[in-house]
A protein has these predicted regions:
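Beta-loop-alpha module in the N-terminal Rossmann-like domain of NAD(P)-dependent dehydrogenases
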Residues: 1-44
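Glycine-rich, N-terminal phosphate-binding loop of Rossmann-like dinucleotide-binding domains
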Residues: 5-6, 84, 163
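A short helix->loop->beta-strand "cap" motif at the edges of active sites that frequently abuts
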Residues: 21-23, 48-51, 157-158
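Structural detector of well-ordered beta-strand residues that form the stable sheet scaffold
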Residues: 26, 51-53, 81, 134, ...
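Rossmann-fold dehydrogenase core element
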Residues: 40-57, 76-79
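Predominantly a Rossmann-like dinucleotide-binding segment in NAD(P)-dependent oxidoreductases
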Residues: 58-131
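Contiguous beta-strand/loop segments that form the cofactor/metal-binding neighborhood of enzyme cores
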Residues: 119-167
Length: 167
């Protein structure tokens, strides 16, 4: 088995190559840059009879399982709020002109792909797919998002997700 923790834009190519050689793959989040890459990765896993797994650790945490198990005991939930914000030490270098992969569009960087995915994965895992999604972001000079907000609506409920690499 191999563990892939390279920039997101390289995940599909590297994972598919490994799976074609019969290796199981544990791939860091975000799994792929887009749906087409993810589908190609899933096909490669199936075609080569190997396991492809995204390293989304929080959904395997015992606390997450406990929340999921007991969520219905809370009664009707009308408001959901999720946040993953951390000031990236690489943001200081970015402001000085150094572009690392987390802030590079060609590497599929940005706050949503790096930390916002934790909010999205948790929301869908706990509450299912929303009916509607709207979003806004703070764009950086490279075209990626430094921070953002997602609003997801469910019948009788609304979820807000905030994520950031710059605050």
């Amino acid at each position: 088995a191999v563990y892939i923790a390279s920039p997101i834009a390289l995940h599909a190519m590297q994972a598919i190559k490994m799976m074609m050689h019969g290796k199981h793959v544990l791939c860091e989040k975000s799994l792929a840059s887009n749906l087409a890459e993810a589908e190609a990765m899933f096909r490669a896993a199936e075609d080569n009879n190997v396991i492809l797994m995204e390293a989304m650790r929080p959904i395997h945490d015992p606390g997450y399982a406990l929340i999921k198990k007991n969520l219905k005991k809370l009664g009707r939930i009308r408001k959901i709020y999720l946040n993953f914000s951390e000031y990236s030490r690489r943001y200081n270098a970015f402001k000085e002109g150094e572009i690392t992969s987390v802030f590079a569009r060609e590497m599929s960087g940005g706050a949503l792909m790096d930390v916002g995915v934790y909010c999205v994965e948790s929301l869908i895992g706990l509450f299912g797919m929303p009916e509607k999604i709207t979003s806004a972001m703070i764009p950086l000079k490279t075209g990626v998002d430094g921070a953002g907000k997602i609003i997801a609506t469910y019948p009788g409920a609304i979820a807000e997700m905030d994520y950031s690499k710059i605050t």
